[in-house]
Amino acid sequence: MTDEALSIYDEIEIEDMIFDPNLQIYHYPCPCGDRFEIAIDDLRDGEDIAVCPSCSLMIRVIFEVVCSLPASTRSRIWDADNVPYLQSDLPKDGNQPAPGAVSVQA
């Protein structure tokens, strides 16, 4: 569906949404009393529209995509200045990505 065909109620930063780790969804209160929902897998697929299951309202979720590198290129990574650094220099597994970032497979 094109943006022109969608009636977007609001645009919400992903930092303002609540993540449910059990259901793997982000949600945000809807004016109807229910909540807008979007699955983490939908975000990874590039979807940015959260819907309310109880009414016709939709919101656009504003987020930054962070790509995960294929296994063959993970040991060496280049920064913006084209300077390589090692995967071991990155934050350890227990650390979360930056607020507003959604990790996706490249």
Swiss-Prot record:
UniProt cross-references to InterPro entries, sorted A to Z: DPH3/4-like, DPH_MB_dom, DPH_MB_sf
Pfam families in UniProt: Zn_ribbon_CSL
Requisite cofactors: Fe(2+)
Major subcellular site: cytoplasm
An example Gene Ontology biological process: tRNA wobble base 5-methoxycarbonylmethyl-2-thiouridinylation
Binding site for Fe cation: C30, C32, C52, C55
Molecular function as annotated in GO: ferrous iron binding; iron chaperone activity; oxidoreductase activity
Entry's localization field: Cytoplasm; Nucleus
Boundaries of every DPH-type MB domain copy: 8-64
Keyword entries, A-Z: Cytoplasm, Iron, Metal-binding, Nucleus, Oxidoreductase
Gene Ontology cellular component list: cytoplasm; nucleus
Database matches in SUPFAM superfamilies: CSL zinc finger (SSF144217)
Involved pathway(s): Protein modification; peptidyl-diphthamide biosynthesis
Keyword Glycoprotein on entry: no
Reaction catalyzed: [3Fe-4S](1+)-[protein] + Fe(2+)-[Dph3] = [3Fe-4S](0)-[protein] + Fe(3+)-[Dph3]; 2 [3Fe-4S](0)-[protein] + 2 Fe(2+)-[Dph3] + NADH = 2 [4Fe-4S](1+)-[protein] + 2 [Dph3] + NAD(+) + H(+)
Oligomer and partners: Component of the 2-(3-amino-3-carboxypropyl)histidine synthase complex composed of dph1, dph2, dph3 and a NADH-dependent reductase, predominantly cbr1.
Functional description taken from the UniProt entry: Required for the first step of diphthamide biosynthesis, a post-translational modification of histidine which occurs in elongation factor 2. Dph1 and dph2 transfer a 3-amino-3-carboxypropyl (ACP) group from S-adenosyl-L-methionine (SAM) to a histidine residue, the reaction is assisted by a reduction system comprising dph3 and a NADH-dependent reductase, predominantly cbr1. Acts as an electron donor to reduce the Fe-S cluster in dph1-dph2 keeping the [4Fe-4S] clusters in the active and reduced state.
Family to which this protein belongs: Belongs to the DPH3 family.
Notes on the domains: The DPH-type metal-binding (MB) domain can also bind zinc. However, iron is the physiological binding partner as zinc binding impairs the protein electron donor function.
Protein name: Diphthamide biosynthesis protein 3
